[in-house]
C-alpha cells in the first residue's frame, strides 16, 4: 500500500514540473541529417558515418579509440578487429593507421597488425624465459608460436639481446639464440666426444646420435680444431659427407701405407679407400711426390716392380723364348692393370722389340713363334703329299694357280680355249678306269667337320656355285689340332696363351702349307705328267665304248615292266653314266692341273668345282650333263652327252651291228670269267641271271642286286622248266641265308637267345651246305650252254 502511494506522489510531481516548464524549438531527425550533409559537403565539418548509419564519428575519435583498443589488447591488435569494434569502414581504419605510425614511433604495422614496443618487450621477456629454461630457442619456432615473420622477429629480438634477453645469437646461423651455459655445455660434450674418436667418423652421424645442434657443432668443432684443442681435421667442410679424421688415425694410416708400399712395391686404390682415404690418387701423389710411380686403373706400381717386369721381358726377347708376367706381379693386380703395366714396359723397346703380347700378360719373341711354326714343317710335307694323292682338286684353286710362276706362260695365252685344250689333250690327259663298265662300283666321300674349325678356314661350296669369290680351300690344321701339338712342346703354359698362339699361327701355317702344296703339286706334276696324261685318242676310244655300252644296256631294259625299268635306269645313271661323265670332267680338269689318278673318285661336289672354272660355252653343256645324272631318262642323258662331247671336241664312234656283236661277246666273256672264280652265292645268282638273260635275248643288261628276282621271273618263259626251277630254288636258299645273317647280326650277345642261336646255326649250316652243292649246277647253266652255243662274234 505504501508503495502505491509513493508511485502516486512521483507522478504528481512530474505533472507539476511539466506545467511550469518553458517550451523550446526542436529539429526533426531529417532536418538534422540534411544540415550535417550540407556542412560535410562544404568541408566545414569532418565526420565519418558508422557502418549502421546511426552515428557520426570524427577521425580524431577513431584514432583515440584505436589507441585505446591497442592498449587494452596488450600492444598488438589486428586492424580487422578494430574495424569491428569501432564500427566504421576498413578504409578509414587503414588511413588512421598510417597517421598513428607517423606520429608514434613506437607503433609499427606488421602483417595487418598494429604492434607497439610494449608488446615486443613482453614477447622478449617470454622468449627469455624459454631460453633460460631450454638453453636455446630458434626463430623458426618463435615464428610459429607468435605468428610473426622471421626477419621482423630476429630484428626485434636482436635489439633486446643483453637487455631483456640473456643470451646471444649464433653468428653462423642467425636463426638460433643460445645461452652461454648452453654453449659451454655443448662445447664440453663436443670436446669430450671428439677427443675419444680414434678413427674417421662422419660428423652427420654424431649429430643425429647425440642430438647436437648442427651449426653449433660445426662452429665449436672448427674452433676446437683451429685452437689445437682437438688433434684432427674435418674433411669435406660443412656438408653431409663431412668426416672427422683424428691425427692418431692419420699417423697410423700413413705408417701402414708407407710400410705396405715399401714391402710390396705397389698400392691398391680400393685398399686406401677402405682405410678412409677418399681420394687415393691425390693422396698418393701428395705423399710420394718425389717418387717415380706408375698409375694404373686400380693400382699404383713402384719403379722396382716395373724394372723387374722389364728385365724379364728383355731376357725373353733376347733369348728367343716367352715369359708370363703374371707370376711376377701381385695376385691382387687385375688382368687389365697387368696389361697396362706390360704396355708401359714394352713402350721403351719401340719398333726394335721383335715380340708379340698374348693373353694380355704373355710376351712371346718372334724367334719363338718361328720355332713353333718349324714344329709343323715335316707334318706339312707329309700331309701335302697325302692330300695330293687322294684329291688334288681340294688343294689347288684357280687363285692359287695364278700365283704359281711355272704357269705364267700358260696364263698369257688365252686366245682360244678349245685349241689350247686340244693341244694339251694330244700331250696326255688324266688316266681313267678301264673296262666296259659292266659292274662299275659307286664311291662316296664322307666329309668330316672339326669342332675347332674357324670361319676363315671353311669353304662354302655354294659360294662357288653362285660365282662369288672365296678364299683358297686349303687348311693345314684346325685350331684344336695346333693346340694339341703346342701343348706337347710348350711346358707349363697357360691354356689361354696356348689357344691364342694357336689362333695366331693358323694363317701363317696355312700360308706355308699352301707353298708346300704348290711345291709338291708342281714336282708331282712334272715327275709323273707323262704317265698320268692320256691322249685324246685314248679318251675318245673309252668314251665311245661306254657310250655304246649304255645304248645296249638301254635296249636290254625295255624287256621289263615300267617299275623295273625305272630301277634299272637309276642304276645305270649312277654307275656307267657317272663313269663317262667323270671321264670328261677329268679331261677338262687337266687344263687347270686338277686331274685325278682315278676318275671314279670324282664326286658331285668336285664336278661343281670344275664347272666353276670352265668357259661359259663349255660350262652350259657340261652343267646339263651333270644335272642329267639326277634325272630318270637315259635318252635325256645321251642327248646331253652328245652336246657335251661336241662342246669338248670329243668325237664319239657310234656302234654298228658288227661292233655291237663284239661288245656283247666281250661283255659275256667278262661276266663268265667272273662267274668262274666267285664263290659268293648271291653274286653267283646275280651273274647267272644276267648271263641267262643275255643268252636268251641277245641283249646286255646292267642290273643291281635288288632286280635279280625280276630277271628270274622274266626267264621263266625263256629257259627250260628244270633250269628255271633250279634257279628259283637257288634264289630261295640265297634269300634264306641273307635273312639268317641279318638275324644273327641283330641279336648281338643276348644270353637268353642261346637256344635260338643253336637252332639258327644248324639251319645256316644246312643252307650253306645246300648252296655249295647247287652252286656248280647253277654255274653250269651258263658255262655249259656257252660251250655248246654258237659263237656270237
From Swiss-Prot:
Effects seen without this gene: Embryonic lethality caused by impaired erythroid development. Conditional deletion in adult mice results in severe anemia and cytopenia. Cells show elevated endoplasmic reticulum stress and unfolded protein response in bone marrow cells and impaired autophagic degradation. Conditional knockout in cardiomyocytes causes age-dependent cardiomyopathy and heart failure, characterized by elevated cardiac fetal gene expression, increased fibrosis, and impaired cardiac contractility.
GO cellular component labels: cytoplasm; cytosol; endoplasmic reticulum; endoplasmic reticulum membrane; mitochondrial outer membrane; neuron projection; nucleus; protein-containing complex
Modification Phosphoserine occurs at: 458, 462, 752-753
Residue ranges the record marks as coiled coil: none
One GO MF term attached to the UniProt entry: UFM1 ligase activity
Modified residues (N-acetylalanine): 2
Modified residues (Omega-N-methylarginine): 433
Pfam family, one: UFL1
Renumbered residue ranges of the record's region Mediates interaction with TRIP4: 200-400
Region Mediates interaction with CDK5RAP3: start-end pairs: 490-683
EC category: transferase
Residue segments, region Disordered: 410-473, 742-765
Residue ranges crossing the lipid bilayer per the database entry: none
Origin: domain of life: Eukaryota
Cell location: Endoplasmic reticulum membrane; Cytoplasm, Cytosol; Nucleus; Chromosome
Record key words, sorted: Acetylation, Chromosome, Cytoplasm, DNA damage, DNA repair, Endoplasmic reticulum, Membrane, Methylation, Nucleus, Phosphoprotein, Transferase, Ubl conjugation, Ubl conjugation pathway
Post-translational modification: Ubiquitinated, leading to its degradation by the proteasome. Interaction with CDK5RAP3 protects both proteins against ubiquitination and degradation via the proteasome. Phosphorylated at Ser-462 by ATM, enhancing protein ligase activity and promoting ATM activation in a positive feedback loop. Phosphorylation at Thr-535 by AMPK promotes its interaction with YWHAG/14-3-3-gamma, thereby preventing UFL1 association with PDCD1/PD-1 substrate.
Region Mediates interaction with DDRGK1: start-end pairs: 2-200
EC number: 2.3.2.-
Region ranges (Required for E3 UFM1-protein ligase activity): 2-212
Function of the molecule: E3 protein ligase that mediates ufmylation, the covalent attachment of the ubiquitin-like modifier UFM1 to lysine residues on target proteins, and which plays a key role in various processes, such as ribosome recycling, response to DNA damage, interferon response or reticulophagy (also called ER-phagy). Catalyzes ufmylation of many protein, such as CD274/PD-L1, CDK5RAP3, CYB5R3, DDRGK1, EIF6, histone H4, MRE11, P4HB, PDCD1/PD-1, TRIP4, RPN1, RPS20/uS10, RPL10/uL16, RPL26/uL24, SYVN1/HRD1 and TP53/p53.
Family the UniProt entry places it in: Belongs to the UFL1 family.
Name assigned to this protein: E3 UFM1-protein ligase 1
Organism: Mus musculus
Gene: Ufl1
Amino acid at each position: 500500500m505504501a508503495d502505491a502511494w509513493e508511485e502516486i506522489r512521483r507522478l504528481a510531481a512530474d505533472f507539476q514540473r511539466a506545467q511550469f516548464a518553458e517550451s523550446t524549438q526542436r529539429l526533426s531527425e531529417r532536418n538534422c541529417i540534411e544540415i550535417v550533409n550540407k556542412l560535410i559537403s562544404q568541408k566545414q565539418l569532418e565526420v565519418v558515418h558508422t557502418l549502421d548509419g546511426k552515428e557520426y564519428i570524427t577521425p580524431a575519435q577513431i584514432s583515440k579509440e584505436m589507441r585505446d583498443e591497442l592498449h587494452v589488447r596488450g600492444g598488438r591488435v589486428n586492424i580487422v578487429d578494430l574495424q569491428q569494434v569501432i564500427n566504421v569502414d576498413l578504409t578509414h581504419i587503414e588511413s588512421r593507421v598510417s597517421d598513428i605510425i607517423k606520429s608514434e614511433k613506437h607503433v609499427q604495422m606488421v602483417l595487418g597488425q598494429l604492434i607497439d614496443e610494449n608488446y615486443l618487450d613482453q614477447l622478449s621477456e617470454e622468449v627469455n624465459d624459454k631460453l633460460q629454461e631450454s638453453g636455446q630457442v630458434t626463430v623458426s619456432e618463435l615464428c610459429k608460436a607468435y605468428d610473426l615473420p622471421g626477419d621482423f622477429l630476429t630484428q626485434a629480438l636482436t635489439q633486446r639481446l643483453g637487455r631483456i634477453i640473456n643470451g646471444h645469437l649464433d653468428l653462423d646461423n642467425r636463426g638460433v639464440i643460445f645461452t652461454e651455459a648452453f654453449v659451454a655445455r655443448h662445447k664440453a660434450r663436443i670436446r669430450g666426444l671428439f677427443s675419444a674418436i680414434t678413427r674417421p667418423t662422419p660428423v652427420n652421424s654424431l649429430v643425429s646420435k647425440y642430438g647436437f645442434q648442427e651449426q653449433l657443432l660445426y662452429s665449436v668443432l672448427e674452433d676446437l680444431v683451429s685452437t689445437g684443442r682437438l688433434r684432427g681435421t674435418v674433411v669435406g667442410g660443412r656438408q653431409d659427407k663431412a668426416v672427422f679424421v683424428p691425427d692418431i688415425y692419420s699417423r697410423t694410416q700413413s705408417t701402414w701405407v708407407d710400410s705396405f708400399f715399401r714391402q710390396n712395391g705397389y698400392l691398391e686404390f680400393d685398399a686406401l679407400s677402405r682405410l678412409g682415404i677418399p681420394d687415393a690418387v691425390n693422396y698418393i701423389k701428395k705423399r710420394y711426390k718425389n717418387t717415380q710411380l706408375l698409375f694404373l686403373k686400380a693400382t699404383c706400381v713402384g719403379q722396382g716392380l716395373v724394372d723387374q717386369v722389364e728385365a724379364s721381358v728383355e731376357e725373353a726377347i733376347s733369348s728367343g723364348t716367352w715369359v708370363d708376367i703374371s707370376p711376377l706381379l701381385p695376385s691382387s693386380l687385375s688382368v687389365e692393370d697387368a696389361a697396362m703395366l706390360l704396355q708401359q714396359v714394352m713402350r721403351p723397346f719401340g719398333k726394335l722389340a721383335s715380340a708379340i703380347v698374348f693373353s694380355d700378360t704373355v710376351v712371346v719373341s718372334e724367334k719363338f713363334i718361328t720355332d713353333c711354326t718349324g714344329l709343323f714343317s715335316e707334318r706339312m710335307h707329309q700331309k701335302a703329299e697325302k692330300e695330293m694323292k687322294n684329291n688334288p682338286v681340294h688343294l689347288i684353286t684357280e687363285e692359287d694357280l695364278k700365283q704359281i710362276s711355272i704357269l705364267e706362260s700358260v696364263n698369257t695365252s688365252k686366245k682360244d680355249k678349245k685349241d689350247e685344250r686340244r693341244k694339251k689333250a694330244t700331250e696326255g690327259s688324266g688316266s681313267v678306269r678301264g673296262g666296259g663298265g659292266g659292274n662299275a662300283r659307286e664311291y662316296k666321300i664322307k666329309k668330316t667337320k672339326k669342332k675347332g674349325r674357324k670361319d676363315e678356314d671353311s669353304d662354302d661350296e655354294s659360294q662357288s656355285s653362285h660365282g662369288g669369290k672365296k678364299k683358297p680351300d686349303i687348311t693345314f690344321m684346325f685350331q684344336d689340332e695346333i693346340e694339341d701339338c703346342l701343348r706337347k712342346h710348350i711346358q707349363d703354359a697357360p691354356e689361354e696363351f696356348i689357344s691364342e698362339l694357336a689362333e695366331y699361327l693358323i694363317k701363317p701355317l696355312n700360308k706355308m702349307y699352301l707353298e708346300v702344296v704348290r711345291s709338291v703339286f708342281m714336282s708331282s706334276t712334272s715327275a709323273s705328267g707323262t704317265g698320268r696324261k692320256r691322249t685324246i685318242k685314248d679318251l675318245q676310244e673309252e668314251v665311245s665304248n661306254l657310250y655304246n655300252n649304255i645304248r645296249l644296256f638301254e635296249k636290254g631294259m625295255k624287256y621289263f615292266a615300267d617299275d623295273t625299268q625305272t630301277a634299272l635306269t637309276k642304276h645305270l645313271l649312277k654307275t656307267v653314266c657317272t663313269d663317262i661323265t667323270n671321264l670328261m670332267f677329268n679331261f677338262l680338269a687337266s687344263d687347270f692341273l686338277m686331274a685325278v689318278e682315278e676318275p671314279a673318285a670324282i664326286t658331285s661336289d668336285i664336278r661343281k668345282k670344275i664347272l666353276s672354272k670352265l668357259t661359259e660355252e663349255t660350262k652350259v653343256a657340261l652343267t646339263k650333263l651333270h644335272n642329267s645324272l639326277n634325272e630318270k631318262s637315259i635318252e635325256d642323258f645321251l642327248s646331253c652327252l652328245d652336246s657335251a662331247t661336241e662342246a669338248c671336241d670329243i668325237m664319239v664312234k657310234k656302234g654298228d651291228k658288227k661292233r655291237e656283236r663284239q661288245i656283247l661277246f666281250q661283255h659275256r666273256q667278262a661276266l663268265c670269267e667272273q662267274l668262274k672264280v666267285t664263290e659268293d652265292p648271291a653274286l653267283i645268282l646275280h651273274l647267272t641271271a644276267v648271263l641267262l638273260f643275255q643268252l636268251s635275248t641277245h641283249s646286255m643288261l646292267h642290273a643291281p642286286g635288288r632286280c635279280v628276282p625280276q630277271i628270274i621271273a622274266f626267264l621263266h618263259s625263256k629257259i627250260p622248266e628244270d633250269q628255271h626251277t633250279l634257279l628259283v630254288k637257288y634264289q630261295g636258299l640265297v634269300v634264306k641265308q641273307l635273312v639268317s645273317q641279318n638275324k644273327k647280326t641283330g641279336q648281338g650277345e643276348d644270353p637268353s637267345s642261346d637256344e635260338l642261336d643253336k637252332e639258327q646255326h644248324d639251319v645256316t649250316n644246312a643252307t650253306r651246305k645246300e648252296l655249295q652243292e647247287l652252286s656248280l649246277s647253277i654255274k653250269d647253266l651258263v658255262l655249259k650252254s656257252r660251250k655248246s652255243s654258237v659263237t656270237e662274234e
